[in-house]
Amino acid sequence: MAKIIGIDLGTTNSCVAVMEGGKPRVIENAEGTRTTPSIVAYQDDGEILAGAPAKRQAVTNPKNTLYAVKRLIGRRFEEKEVQKDIGLMPYTITKADNGDAWVEVRGQKMAPPPNSAEVLRKMKKTAEDYLGEEVTEAVITVPAYFNDSQRQATKDAGRIAGLEVKRIINEPTAAALAFGLDKQEGDRKIAVYDLGGGTFDISIIEIAEIDGEHQFEVLSTNGDTFLGGEDFDNRLIDFLADEFKKEKRLDLRNDLLAKQRLKEAAEKAKIELSSAQQTEVNLPYITADATGPKHLVVKITRTKFESLVEDLIERSIKPCEVALKDAGVKPSDIQDVILVGGQTRMPKVQEKVKEFFGKEPRKDVNPDEAVAVGAAIQGGVLQGDVKDVLLLDVTPLSLGIETLGGVMTKLIKKNTTIPTKASQVFSTAEDNQNAVTIQVLQGEREMAAGNKSLGQFNLSDIPPAPRGMPQIEVTFDIDANAILHVSAKDKATGKENKITIKANSGLSEEEIKRMEEDAAAYADEDRKLRELVDARNSADGMVHSVKKSLSEHGDKLEAGEKEKIEAAIKDVEDAIKGDDKEAIEAKTNALMEASQKLGEKVYAEQQAQQGGAEEAQPQGEKTVDADVVDAEFEEVKDDKK
């Protein structure tokens, strides 16, 4: 039975894990690392790189190297957070026809899900290489504070990558699973503080033993889907650019290559400042003007960096306060605080968390891997490999519809355990109204306009009646993936209409299907490209070997034989320049046949040299050899006695 893998699709890095022998295992990628950069590069020749290879070429291809795209998934172009990112990213963020935030690659608009699909495809391949079998099913994690359209867009990305997404689970919940699965410490409430590359979540979770079963119940969740390590990097980038501008009067923000180098340097400096009190950013030849090349050399202390990001760390505390209030607990009720996400390695973040909760955060959970491990455990639960685990997650935001006067009427309150279902009866606002529009909303504001619109649908053919008389029953149904299905039914006629909220990724079902097919086609294309490269390498090796033999032993061949081999070499070299695998293999075989005579000459010469060496060997040496052999034989005989 094929395994269900667990994938942490992160903003900055991604990770994949699988259950083996009842234990979760994080899988190393082709580069030998346990996490993979969530970076995708689109090259001139059409090749798509994902992970470390994409990151390595980012400096020379900044406009077509996409990172932190998860921050755009399911978002509108006009949102202030998206507008802020436009000025920071070296690639182009553009407005889709439906008003969503898309990206532009090589002059073409692209929705975020296909880009995320490339990262998922890389994780899928990593798992397949390790397991030695095809992987088609996965549990994928998302930030707990992702709204419905962001969850749908993540599911779409999985489909495009050739994965059936068995479950979408929240990152803090996954981390709690990773932490609590083997703990036998009795009932306890834990806080999962998850500050990743692009998003922040806080979840209050109760772990309980009920009839021998590990129950993980999410009491509340809160967060900020536009707060993460990328924002910390951007503060450092701005600081470095400002320092350079003060000294050299040149703004590096206008130079895409320089901006990309600053991004790499800022990330490196941030990591170093978690263990060192000071670091130096040294970027020679960062730019040039009429007076010549310019170099950037800036020293940064940990204290300076902390002052640059103080407000960002503070921003994470408000959601913690709200989450505790919603769960009905005090900081002193929390037994353990778990840190998740690479940014939690920053000492100042740990200090702030300790100050708020009044206790040291746990250090026995790997912040980069815990989420993928939890996803793999959930995969094991779904597959039946992990028993006695019950996961009770919640919906992060309230759900409702727009009613008379532009008010949002909530049907499902935030932090309701899922799956769940709720119904409410509404009526018409006008006499003889024959249709109603159901506007589905998500958020906490009282007025509809202040909340996120997830979609709308109509219920028509309502029989004429005075206002307030018809009874329209609206039902909200949230599945285990926290994805919403809405229906409206006229109780008098039984007429019903329903909608599954689709992702705000601007991708229709047809487009997603086409992308799935493209992915399968690309897999075949990749295989063919690999075979072509192997054929070229084999041919190149053959040419090198024959040329070497020809230079050493060519004088022993007849002129005609030598010319024939040289002509065959030229044929292979010409074939290598093309893309015809069969032609390369045919020419390589022809060269092999043509050089057969040469091979025979080389072999004969080697035999002759070997024979001559044996004859020339002094008699004394032969005697020594004989003695050695006899001695070995005698030793064996002695052992047997």
UniProtKB/Swiss-Prot annotation:
Any one Gene Ontology molecular-function term assigned to this protein's record: ATP binding
Keywords assigned: ATP-binding, Chaperone, Nucleotide-binding, Phosphoprotein, Stress response
InterPro entries: ATPase_NBD (IPR043129), Chaperone_DnaK (IPR012725), Heat_shock_70_CS (IPR018181), HSP70_C_sf (IPR029048), HSP70_peptide-bd_sf (IPR029047), Hsp_70_fam (IPR013126)
Residue numbers of Phosphothreonine PTMs: T199
Pfam families: HSP70
Renumbered residue ranges of the record's region Disordered: 602-627
Stretches with biased composition (Low complexity): 604-621
UniProt-listed CDD domains: ASKHA_NBD_HSP70_DnaK-like (cd10234)
Induction comment from the UniProt entry of this chain: By stress conditions e.g. heat shock.
Job description of the protein: Acts as a chaperone.
PANTHER family membership: HEAT SHOCK PROTEIN 70KDA
Family listed: Belongs to the heat shock protein 70 family.
NCBIfam families with a match to the protein in the record: PRK00290.1, PRK05183.1, prok_dnaK
Designated name of the protein: Chaperone protein DnaK
